[in-house]
Amino acid sequence: RMEDVMTLRELSYEYKAHADTLSLRMKQLRLAARETEDPERRHRLERRILELRPLLQEARELAVLTRNYYDRRYHKNEKYTL
């Protein structure tokens, strides 16, 4: 159905929101890692931050790509080009 179709620009807002959520979570994890005195917990928190970093980067890249996809002046990220 046509009303269920999402444009690339609308999709870019979803990617941006996802990136914002990931960024906030990473800030929370960094704070928790700084505040804990348990070395094992700190290690787990830091590891989780490292695992989230590529997801955040990808969400940011895809937000830009989908927002600018039809702009002829935009130089697309080769990582996402077929």
Regions found by a protein language model. Give the residues of each.
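Short, charged, amphipathic alpha-helical segments
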Residues: Y13, P39-P54
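Long amphipathic alpha-helical coiled-coil segments
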Residues: E40-R41, L65-L82
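Secondary-structure edge/capping motif, primarily at the C-terminal ends of alpha-helices
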Residues: L29-E40
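Short, charge/polar-rich alpha-helical segments
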Residues: R1-S23, L31
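Amphipathic alpha-helical coiled-coil segments
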Residues: M26, R48-D71
